[in-house]
Amino acid sequence: KGDPASVPSWRPDIQGEADLVEEIARVVSLTKLQGIPLPRNTNAVPKPVLSATQLREQTSRRAAAELGYNECVSYSFIDENSAKLFGGGDASTQLENPISSEMSHMRPDLFPGLLQAASRNQARGFFNMALFELGPVFNGGDPGNQQNNLSGVLIGQTASKDVHGQDREVDVFDVKCHIENILSLIGAPSKFQILRGAESHWHPGRHGRICLGPKKTIGIFGELHPKILSSFDIKGPTVGFTILLDNIPTPRNSNTTRPPFRARSLQAVERDFAFVVGAKVEASVITTAAMGSKKDIIEEVRVFDEFIGGDLGDGKKSVAITV
């Protein structure tokens, strides 16, 4: 009611209004206070704390770690020469007041930091490694030119030789398996195309772009160009992958209930077909055409053989598929 109150010298624990209110409530009796329950969610399930983007990043980190990759955290600033190797290094990404000459530009890719870390490890005698990093990359000076990527590198041998077999060098199919695994765990569409034509730091003819249509790229995998490895003093076979997290569409909120099971009246069968086509025809063209011929009954089309030479003649190849 506005009455003044003084604190005795032997009560140094009372520092403010909240402490005074607590003392009054204790003297009067806490049982006389009316309890007010906290508001509860009507669905009895707490709302998620992480956003969809944060949850996707967390899932991709865990997926890469489960595949045996060690996470790196590097600076977003790199030197001009390294930036130019990956398509950057122009005035739009240059810092006005850089920390040093080695941190003068915003990174256009995550590979410079990963390769620098790999080079330092190789200088100390560690030649087999699997590293990944998740972070922003910058393709210009405007806010819309920033996107989040997940990149990883495999270097050296897959495993040490033992009584069960010899070791082997890492190859493109190792990272192809890894990137497809991560994409499936973060909810990317399972139907995609693998095309060519990535940036110049990828080895020509030894890489692939995972696309949703001909223009929307969600991932790249393959061997890194030898000139890139030479610039960072990397020894041994090196393959890598990049996932463009911002390009992956967010899955729609679908109903959790499943439709009733409907048994098919047709028996499951497999048939093999071989087609003679031009040497430059992509296998995905054949599989897409085969899948589209009878979408209601065809569940899967996969390539199992390719033959070039023999009686086919120049500029021809045979592609065999299983339907």
Regions inferred by a protein language model and the residue ranges of each:
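Short capping/connector residues at structural and topological boundaries
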Residues: 19, 38-41, 82-83, 98-100, ...
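Hydrophobic/anchoring residues in structured secondary elements
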Residues: 38, 74, 136-139, 194, ...
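Mobile "lid/hinge" segments at catalytic clefts and subdomain interfaces of large enzymes
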Residues: 121, 125, 130, 137-148
